[in-house]
């Protein structure tokens, strides 16, 4: 088709335009490369197709040379660019390998006197904050040690033991509130001592008036010696009662005055001496101290002593004196020797420091405490 177009005489006038246009395009790349330009085509004749024949191969050769030259330039440029990139990457790797040992830490600036003063001031402030934080933590742990059911003047619980005991104590109280039942002393101590060390377990058992050896033996038992309700068997412990009034209340049950038929409890030999003494004093089998004026005052809100709630009775300062179990009943005939000398204040003794007050806040007055104290005796015999 191209040969036919160039051979037609009607298109001869357009051929020089294509030739001159091709020469104009080829001038710039040839001048850039430094090659000698081809000779200009001869001027067209008056009417012969000679100029068409002479001009026909010129644009084709120019276009083919230009395309070949451009392709070579592109290939050389691509190869050169790839080589430069590879060289730059190799140089970067070499520089990185050479600089790695130098970048192990931040560059230390020169410590001036002002910077030293600022650093010292920041360190002092940080030390003060840490000291205050530890003081607050120790104060909070001391307050926590006061409310957990484990107190000793000679032994101090560690921080982790205090937190574990507090967690167990909160769990035990939540279980008591959830069930609404009076807890068994052995199971209560087992709940408190879960996850604690042996010294802490012994301390908790001693604070709750439970023999640690009996506690360890009863842990594997199937519930023998526990509180099963009215008429159940009870195990005696060689510890005295924490309240000296419990013996008188037990004697009321032995004499048949305080609802002894409702609870078939085991009586003890030392109650008979108390009963005869109180009957001779005119108390009708009850302790004469219950009729004194110091028990007529109103009851104050319950207090928490060593983790156990107790009801404190307000009284005048004249009646504030200390009661000792062995001193109070040592002169009585047939009195039972005590294994421990527990000293309680008058308010603590009259309030009945025991764990049974945990749920029974509606305590009766002292002249109506027979059945309740029978249950307390049964609880502490477990």
UniProtKB/Swiss-Prot annotation:
Gene Ontology molecular function terms on file: DNA-binding transcription activator activity, RNA polymerase II-specific; DNA-binding transcription factor activity; DNA-binding transcription factor activity, RNA polymerase II-specific; E-box binding; protein heterodimerization activity; sequence-specific double-stranded DNA binding
Chain intervals for the UniProt region annotation (Disordered): 1-129
Segments of skewed composition (Low complexity): 50-59
GO-annotated cellular components: chromatin; nucleus
UniProt domain bHLH: residue ranges: 121-173
Listed Basic residues bias regions: 101-113
UniProt domain comment: The C-terminal region is necessary for depolarization-induced and calcium-dependent transcription activation.
Disease in which the protein is involved: Developmental and epileptic encephalopathy 72: A form of epileptic encephalopathy, a heterogeneous group of severe early-onset epilepsies characterized by refractory seizures, neurodevelopmental impairment, and poor prognosis. Development is normal prior to seizure onset, after which cognitive and motor delays become apparent. DEE72 is an autosomal dominant form with variable severity and onset in infancy.
Name by which UniProt lists this protein: Neurogenic differentiation factor 2
Species of origin: Homo sapiens
Gene transcribed to yield this protein: NEUROD2
